Amino acid sequence: MSDPHFAAYSFVDRITEFHAGKRARGAFAIPPHVAAFPPALVAEAVGQLAAWVAMDAIDFRGRPVAALATETRFEGDAKPGDTLELAVDIEQCDDEAVAYDGHASVGGRRVIELADCLGPMLPVADFDSPDALRERLSLLRAEGAPAGRFAGVGDIAVNVNRLTPGSGLHATIDVPSAAPFFADHFPRRPVFPATLLLDLMMRRALDVARGSPALGESARAVRVTHVKMRSFIVPSQRLDVEIALGAVDDGVAKAMLSAKTGERLVASARLELMAEA
């Protein structure tokens, strides 16, 4: 990849409808050559569209960061070669924070829905060039960006130290010291993406759930709530991950996901899983 900026972790190719400070519609063509495009990255695409509306609304003085998503519903899968149809509606936006709802579809079929998301604003110049972002938004709203530049994020090892099928696990994640996505997220201040961490934790939660006799191999994630990022995760940081799966009630099990550095909690979420019908 010649230049990972706006490529290695950017999931909006075109903005087809834009109402300043209010709403937007856009698209992202998932490259057919990537191995997969998991639900957490679909949620990232929706959040990035909201970020474009938010940054434009305050003249690129700030940018929202992933901090709190009250509810995300997983309604279907997006596959390599699919085109995501993205939509966001802004409830409130100022220099302090943006609040929004959004969803993504494939071929008119809803695959994800985000409700009551809140992203606090931080100075945009700490993370990226305001001028480069303005130019990028103009491109997205005009002819769109070249598709197919996303090459995947590569393998990030999750080292499982303890696994109790159907109950829980403990694992460690060593955040890479360098990776192409750091040049995109973000050029001036590399941050490990919250949605990438969520994807890694969701995958391990599925490993636990598939060991439950009540869920089995067909277990799938249907909803995540109370996603909270408490601090940035930086290159070379070690994360201790805990997954705790509760009892199955009416066909649904709830898992608590958390990541710590030392004794400090940096991320948490609640994941609901059920057996595929």
Spans of model-derived segments:
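Non-catalytic linker/capping segments at the edges of enzyme domains
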Residues: 1-36, 61, 75-78, 91-97, ...
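Generic low-polarity alpha-helical segments
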Residues: 12-16, 46, 69-71
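Short, well-structured hydrophobic secondary-structure segments
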Residues: 23, 34-57, 193, 197-206
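Hydrophobic pocket/interface hotspot
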Residues: 46, 88, 171
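Hydrophobic beta-strand-centered segment that forms part of the acyl-chain substrate-binding groove
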Residues: 50-87, 112, 118-120, 202-242, ...
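Phosphate-/nucleic-acid-contacting segments
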Residues: 103
